[in-house]
Each structure stands twice: as structure tokens, then as C-alpha cells.
């Protein structure tokens, strides 16, 4: 296999922004101008499951791959896999995540000279796919989108109105993390932020504005994000390609992943993506 190199770095925070932990995997002989920036999903993180193996395979095929943890995903710089920072998790919202993508793209272009004129692609899994779509509608010069089991809207994923009323009354709502057994808090501001910015946080309108190519990869056995989401995304894409597989929401992968191979469905998606971007 061709050699790759990997470096970790932190995009420093400000008084108003938390730091973002990143890693960049690229071909050992770096000669291309292609970069995928990957957005993880809800309760996810950059080192989940097979994401490191996926980064390696893209780099082995000449495409650099950057993964990052959203600044408020609940991880920390020193403990990026579990969720020790529940305060940050509770303060997260969609607007913060879209801004995080903007910060990452800007940092890459300013700090890595060999990417200053790169073709930049956004890839997102599940909720991260929607964030990638919205970010692409900003003036970031994104070349293409790759959406993995992506949601097609956020509004329908909120609970029923009676639950929203309880959420508002209590100020916080808890969701279980089955992996860590934690009760993860969502402050009501998460919902209020969506309501206040609904027109901006609209995946359909964002995708219709995006003039580049979009690859939509989705499993027909996905129980977390129904396949109809993929059909929606495809219908809204100006240049859309749908890749349908008989697989689940994580394409046969899980966390932790202790194997040294990529599950078949995810490997097929990587191969399809490489072809799509060539």
C-alpha cells in the first residue's frame, strides 16, 4: 500500500469559540490538490469506528483527508473519544457546527500553503451530512459533496410539540448515550437556535444553491435515517448521484472497531467516492 502521513493539530479557540481538534492524513508524496473535510454525526467524533481506516484509504489513493471534532461535541482536546465536557455538549447547536466547518476550511487554506488553491470536498455522516450541505451554501468554494446516510432536514427530527413544551419548561432535555451510558443534556437553546435560524439551517434550500456535484450514499436498511432522506437529497441536488446499498446506518461499521479491514459496504462507498471525485 502507498505510504501516508498523519498529523494532529488544534484550531485554537477565542473568547467566543472553543478549540477544534483535527487530524490530517495525506499521501506520503504529497503532489495533488485534493482534500476531503469530514463532518461526523450526532454523538459522534472523528475517531469513531472505521473513520481512521477510511482516511487512510483515501490518502493511499491520492486524496488527503481531514477529520475534526465539532467544537461542542462533548469531547475535549485530551479526551476526544468519550464525552467529559457535558457543559459544551449542552451548549451545542446547528449554527455552531456550521461555523465550525467554516473555521476548518479557512484554517486549512490559510495555514497549509499546499491547500491554498486546493479542490475541497465536504463529506458528512448522518447529521454531519446536513451540516456539510448548509456549509456548502456559504462562500467556501466547495467543489463537491459526499453525503453518508445523511439527514435531509432537521425540523422533523425534533420531538413532538408536547415534548418541546416540556423541554422549554424544564430548560433541558436528556438523551442517553448507549455507548457511554451517559445522560447527555440538550439545553432548550438548541431548539430555539433552530427556530431563530430556520431559513439558514434549511438543507433543501442549501443543496439547491450548491452548484457542485453531490454523491449521496445510503443504506436501505438504515433504521436511524430513513432511505427517503436520500431520495429527497438526490431530488434537490443540481448534479446528484445516488449510491444505494443494502446496509445499515453505519455501513457495517461500529465502535470500537478492532479489525484492520474496512467493512464491505463502507469500502464500496470509498471506492465509489474516489471514482466520483476523479
What residues fall within each predicted segment?
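Acidic catalytic loop of the alpha/beta-hydrolase fold
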Residues: 221-225, 249
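Alpha/beta-hydrolase active-site loop
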Residues: 87-112
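Short alpha-helix in the alpha/beta-hydrolase fold that links the catalytic acid
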Residues: 51, 212, 225-235
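Short beta-strand/loop motif that positions the catalytic acidic residue
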Residues: 209-210, 216-218, 222
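Short, surface-exposed "cap/lid" segments of acyl-processing enzymes
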Residues: 29-74
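N-terminal cap/lid segment of alpha/beta-hydrolase-fold proteins
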Residues: 1-31
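Catalytic active-site module of serine/aspartate enzymes centered on a nucleophile-bearing elbow/loop
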Residues: 247, 251, 255-278
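Primarily recognizes the serine-hydrolase "nucleophile elbow" in alpha/beta-hydrolase
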Residues: 104-166
Amino acid at each position: 500500500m502507498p505510504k501516508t502521513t498523519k498529523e494532529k493539530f488544534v484550531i485554537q479557540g477565542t473568547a467566543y469559540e472553543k478549540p477544534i481538534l483535527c487530524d490530517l492524513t495525506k499521501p506520503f508524496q504529497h503532489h495533488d490538490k485534493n482534500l476531503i473535510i469530514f463532518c461526523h454525526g450526532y454523538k459522534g467524533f472523528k475517531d469513531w469506528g472505521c473513520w481512521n481506516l477510511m482516511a487512510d484509504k483515501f490518502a493511499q489513493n491520492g486524496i488527503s483527508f481531514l477529520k475534526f471534532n465539532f467544537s461542542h461535541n462533548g469531547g475535549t482536546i485530551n479526551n476526544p473519544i468519550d464525552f467529559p465536557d457535558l457543559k459544551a455538549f449542552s451548549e451545542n447547536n446547528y449554527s455552531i457546527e456550521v461555523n465550525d466547518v467554516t473555521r476548518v476550511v479557512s484554517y486549512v487554506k490559510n495555514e497549509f500553503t499546499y491547500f491554498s488553491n486546493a479542490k475541497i470536498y465536504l463529506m458528512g455522516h448522518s447529521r454531519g451530512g446536513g451540516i456539510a450541505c448548509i456549509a456548502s451554501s456559504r462562500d467556501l468554494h466547495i467543489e463537491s459533496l459526499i453525503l453518508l446516510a445523511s439527514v435531509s432536514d432537521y425540523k422533523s427530527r425534533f420531538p413532538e410539540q408536547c415534548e418541546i413544551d416540556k423541554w422549554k419548561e424544564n430548560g433541558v432535555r436528556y438523551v442517553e448515550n448507549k455507548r457511554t451510558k451517559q445522560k447527555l443534556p440538550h439545553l432548550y437553546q438548541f431548539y430555539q437556535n433552530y427556530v431563530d435560524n430556520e431559513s439558514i439551517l434549511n438543507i433543501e434550500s442549501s443543496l439547491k444553491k450548491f452548484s457542485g456535484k453531490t454523491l449521496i450514499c445510503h443504506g436501505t436498511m438504515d433504521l436511524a435515517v430513513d432511505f427517503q432522506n436520500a431520495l429527497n437529497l438526490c431530488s434537490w441536488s443540481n448534479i446528484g448521484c445516488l449510491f444505494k446499498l443494502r446496509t445499515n446506518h453505519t455501513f457495517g461499521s461500529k465502535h470500537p472497531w478492532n479489525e484492520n479491514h474496512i467493512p464491505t459496504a463502507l469500502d464500496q462507498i470509498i471506492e465509489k467516492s474516489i471514482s466520483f471525485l476523479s
